[in-house]
Each structure stands twice: as structure tokens, then as C-alpha cells.
Design a protein with these regions (language model features):
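HIT superfamily nucleotide-processing domains
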Residues: 1-133
């Protein structure tokens, strides 16, 4: 069982921003920007997005699109960037990152520090927007 599966099952706490029967979205604990969110399939632990079956693959992207719409409404940004790396955690996941510039997607840059209170507030704002969709 991966750490992301444990998060989706509620065994490890997270800042949830969206959820449905098949997918879960939560704030990254080491974000590149305010609102940096990870989107995962709940029941598939493969670490390579292109190994997903067609239904899960399409569903994951549709869910990510809805979450990105909520992020854009809740977090001031020019757009929401997308990255699929799959290098650190062996569980398919999509990064949704609020951007002002292309440089905001630099995974090697110094990352901002957010307090637990700030993360909780951001997650609640995104979840509120998600629930409107």
C-alpha cells in the first residue's frame, strides 16, 4: 500500500481539496506555490500514468480538470499548470500548480513555507469552489 493510498483512505492526514468515488485530491506537503495540489486514483497504485486502463486514465484527467477549475477560482493565479513526473512516490499522480509565470513550475526552486493553518484555509477554499461545480 502506497503513502497516497493511505492518504486517500484517511489513514494519514491530508488537506483534502476534492474527492469522489474513484479519485482524491489534496494539497502537496512540499508545495511549489499556494494551492499546489496532487490528484490521484484511489484504487490504482501503478506508478506510471500511461499504464492506467482507459476508463481510469480518462476519469483521472476529467477529475483533475474540475479540481484545476476550483483551484483557479480559489487561488489568485494566471493559470493552473500540470505536471506528471511519477518519480518520487510509486503511485500515479498529477500535480496541479497555480502559476503566475513559467518559472513557478521549477521543481528545483526554493519552496514557500505555509503554516498548517494556511494550508487548511487554502484547502477549504478550493473544496468550497469544487463543491460549486
Amino acid at each position: 500500500m502506497t503513502i497516497f493510498t493511505k492518504i486517500a483512505k484517511g489513514e494519514i492526514p491530508s488537506y483534502k481539496v476534492a474527492e469522489n468515488e474513484e479519485f482524491y485530491a489534496f494539497l502537496d506537503i512540499n508545495p511549489l506555490a499556494k494551492g499546489h495540489t496532487l490528484v490521484i486514483p484511489k484504487n490504482v497504485e501503478d506508478d506510471y500514468i500511461f499504464h492506467l486502463d482507459e476508463k481510469t486514465y480518462e476519469g483521472l484527467w476529467a477529475f483533475a480538470r474540475k479540481v484545476a477549475t476550483a483551484i483557479k477560482a480559489a487561488v489568485p493565479c494566471q493559470r493552473v499548470g500540470v505536471a506528471v513526473l511519477g518519480m518520487e512516490v510509486p503511485h500515479t499522480h498529477i500535480h496541479l500548480i497555480p502559476l503566475q509565470t513559467e518559472g513557478d513550475m521549477d521543481f528545483k526552486k526554493k519552496r514557500p513555507d505555509f503554516t498548517p493553518e494556511q494550508q487548511a484555509e487554502t484547502a477549504a477554499a478550493i473544496l468550497k469552489e469544487y463543491e460549486k461545480l
